[in-house]
Every structure is written in C-alpha cells, then in structure tokens.
Regions:
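Short, structured beta-strand/loop micro-motifs enriched in basic residues and often containing a Trp
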Residues: 100-106, 246-250, 276-277
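Conserved PDZ fold ligand-binding element
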Residues: 50, 56-57, 254-277
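PDZ/PDZ-like domain micro-motif
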Residues: 169-170, 229-237, 250-268
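Serine-dependent protease modules
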Residues: 1-231, 241-242, 285, 301-304, ...
Length: 317
C-alpha cells in the first residue's frame, strides 16, 4: 500500500539516480616537493558535475596547478580533463572533456536564493575515492555563512549537516527536485555534521563573468564601508541608525568620481534598504552585467541623493 513516506522515498531514488549520472570523480596530479629521489608528485581527489556540453564545474582548489586532470563518469569511463578557468577567489573552476558517455545530460541549476533553513538536500560526490557517486542526505542548517581570507572570499555559504568527506569537494548539493542549489566546498575537520557549499547563484555569476569578459573578474566601486550598528551610530554621532558608513574612498575609482566621500551613508541599494556591508559586495557583483549599481546616499547637511556608480572590474586568479 502506498504511503506518503513510500512515495517520497521512490521520488528520492528517482532524483538521485538522475543526478548521479551527471556527477564525476576528478583525480589530479600536481608537482610536489623535492626529495633525494627527485620531485614527488601530489595526487588529489575531488568531484564535479556536468553543466553544459562537455563542460564540468568543480572547485578551483581541486584542479588548480594540476599537471594531470582525469575525469571519471559513473559508468567508469575516463577522459582527460582540461582546466579552462580556475577562479581561486571564489573557488570555482571549469573543466572540459572531449566527450561524455551517451545519454548523460547536464544537471539543472536551481535558485539558491530560495533556499530555506530546514530544507532537505543531498550531497553527491566521490568521498575518499570510493567508486561511483555516493549520496548523503541532510538539511540546510544555515545560510549566509562566510569564509574570507586574503586570497579567497567565500560568502553566503550554505551550511548543511549532510555528511561530507574529503573527495566530496566540487560535487553538487541538490534539493528534492534534483535541482543543483550549491557546490560542496569545505568541511570543518573533527566537526560532525558541519559542511559548506557555495550557492549555485554564485557559480552562475562566475559563468556570466566568463561569458562577458572571458575570465573571472572581481567587481568593485572603490569604497570601504562599515555596517551601522547602535554602537557605531553612538560613537560617531551619526544621524541615522541604519545603513553603511563610508570610511574610505579610493582615489580614481568610480565612487571617487561619483563624489562619494568618507562620512557618507549608503541607505539603499537598487531601491532596497541596506544594513550589512555584505549586501553591498553582493549587489555590486550582481550588477556586473548591468555595469553600474544604483545607490541612495545620505550626507549630513545635504540630505539624500541617488547616484548610479559604474562598476570597475579586475582579473582574479
């Protein structure tokens, strides 16, 4: 007798089978360290998934600096991979192969902005080098997590308790409809049930940048800003309790040319109120194809004004 649970179980089995066909294992060989026996190669392992005709997306840290990249599909077929793009700043890379097994289709990309905490997700990949895609189930534990360093900026990460192990990096995180909502990127060693995935919308933005510029780029307008908190508002005697306080403007940048100055307060971006500096960074990246970002600026003694600030781009690794 059919029950809602059995129906859901059958649906999950169908989704997982369809998704797994487009997931690959990626093995790499990189130059290693020097020894008395010569250079010792370093072998690496990761996952990836098909997003276009003979195009696979994975993490940049999986394939960066690799001398040899092998791509293995679910049926065991193996192809030489060529790294097309490796955006180490966002940890996204594209790898091409000459051919794919018959009948394999690119995975469908969802909308990670619609993810909700508690939503069921599946991580698909090749943990520990085990043959064939492995599937684990969990939920979205949190969204908006950040891992930021000097050469990397992983923002708005999806946190999940779906089991993630070494080798899962680059594999898809999919929802119950089989839509890719993220790409697995990191785990915290010794922490049970804490893994992270790059939102698929971030991957989409990288693809748009590559289509427009031929390479990954970093978007900016040339300001340093701080989120206004009650403490910041009190310390600087600010007239507003919400927004982004401009603390520095880089000379020669679009913001400088738009006459934005330290002490100004960004109150809205594209007509929406703003309170977190991460919203500015994201809005600038989201507007890269548009070429400008529209800001509402408040300056004490002068009131509010709206300004369209052009976006400048610089190449990233």
């Amino acid at each position: 007798m059919a029950t809602p649970l059995k129906d859901f179980n059958e649906h999950v089995i169908k989704v997982v089978n369809e998704v797994s066909r487009g997931v690959v294992t990626i093995t790499t060989v990189k130059l290693g360290f020097e020894s008395i026996f010569g250079t010792v190669p370093i072998r690496g392992l990761g996952s990836g998934f098909l997003i276009g005709e003979n195009i696979i997306v994975t993490n940049a840290h999986v394939v960066s600096d690799a001398r040899v990249v092998d791509v293995i599909f679910f049926d065991g077929s193996r192809f030489d991979g060529k790294v097309l793009i490796a955006d180490t700043y966002r940890d996204v890379a594209l790898v091409s192969v000459e051919d794919v097994p018959k009948g394999i289709k690119p995975l469908s990309l969802g909308d990670s902005d619609q993810l909700r905490v508690g939503e069921i997700v599946f991580a698909v990949g090749s943990p520990l080098g085990l043959p064939g895609p492995t599937v684990t189930m969990g939920v979205v534990s949190a969204v908006g997590r950040n891992i930021v360093g000097e050469d990397v900026a992983l923002e708005d990460l999806i946190q999940t308790d779906a089991a993630i192990n070494p080798g899962n990096s680059g594999g898809p995180l999919v929802n119950v409809d089989g839509m890719v909502v993220g790409m697995v990127t990191a785990i915290i060693p010794y922490a049970q049930g804490v893994g992270f995935a790059i939102p698929i919308n971030t991957v989409k933005r990288v693809l748009e940048m590559i289509e427009a510029y031929g390479r990954p780029v970093r978007a900016m307008i040339g300001v340093y800003a701080a989120s206004i908190t009650p403490q910041v508002a009190s310390a600087y005697r600010l007239p507003l309790k919400r927004g982004l306080l401009i603390v520095r403007v880089i000379p020669g940048t679009p913001a400088y040319e738009a006459r934005i100055a330290p002490g100004d307060i960004i109150t809205k971006i594209a007509g929406k109120e703003v309170s977190d500096v991460r919203e500015l960074r994201r809005a600038v990246e989201d507007s890269i194809m548009q070429g400008y970002v529209e800001l509402e600026i408040y300056r004490q003694g002068y009131g509010y004004r709206r300004v369209k600030v052009p976006i400048m781009v610089e190449e990233v690794g």
